[in-house]
């Protein structure tokens, strides 16, 4: 979780701030001193509470809407809340069981990512988002080449996670079917189980050492592999539940909502934000302007990386209003990241 420079608050001010924010998150209405006097469990007068709330407003943790006598948290107030005041509520046994069952029924990486994003959305009631692993992180299991015409070849790649990619390539010269078969057999025999990022470098290294007829086979392999095994321009991210934000009271400004949905549609900026968190251990929380994206000024993003095979594969998270139930969403994201990573472990290591 991101560290921040929280103001020094005495225990009474911390308790009132926690109570006010928790109640505002629950009800969505500004909270006044009388309400806090009734529900905070402190033996102090409403006048004393008003003075403390005024102090919290002076240091930027609360604000007073013009139409209400109550107060609401600012983005800075939410930051202090999630960094030092929130009391986590981990997912219940039934939620964990549902999440595990949904992931277990998924076949292949894309299906797993889709299930994870849908379950995050369903359990948080907001937007679930998962960044996809880069293909070059996966070992390739098998490759076939199918001639399409004089210049084009269909490369069929099967990866260790059972995903299949079809790529139409245009090698430097025309190949006979027998040549394509020979190259495919060589690549499958020598490089099955290796990551894409390793294969081309190995081919070039072996080509420098090769002699005679082996040199020709390797040269053909380099030509075809240079096209077929480059990282593909994948979508990069799976999202679910975007329309859930349309009914959120805090996101009623249509112009701002349109900007948000345009960001959802393009995905590029959100994916860049997720990429910024991929090497950060544990949960990261961006509140409003902390994202650095104008289109996300009115929302919060809770993320965590997921890992398998000892390496970070991607990031998942929840996008929702700043007034979200952080006590539930933060541990939900943590749990989902752990379970998605476990589901993506190679067979035999789970």
From Swiss-Prot:
Source species, domain of life: Bacteria
Keyword Repressor in record: yes
Q: Which GO terms describe its biological process?
A: negative regulation of DNA-templated transcription
| Keywords linked to the UniProt accession | Repressor, Stress response, Transcription, Transcription regulation
Q: Sorted alphabetically, which PANTHER family does this protein's record hold?
A: HEAT-INDUCIBLE TRANSCRIPTION REPRESSOR HRCA
HAMAP family for this protein: HrcA
Q: Protein name, please?
A: Heat-inducible transcription repressor HrcA
From which organism does this entry originate? Xanthomonas campestris pv. campestris (strain ATCC 33913 / DSM 3586 / NCPPB 528 / LMG 568 / P 25)
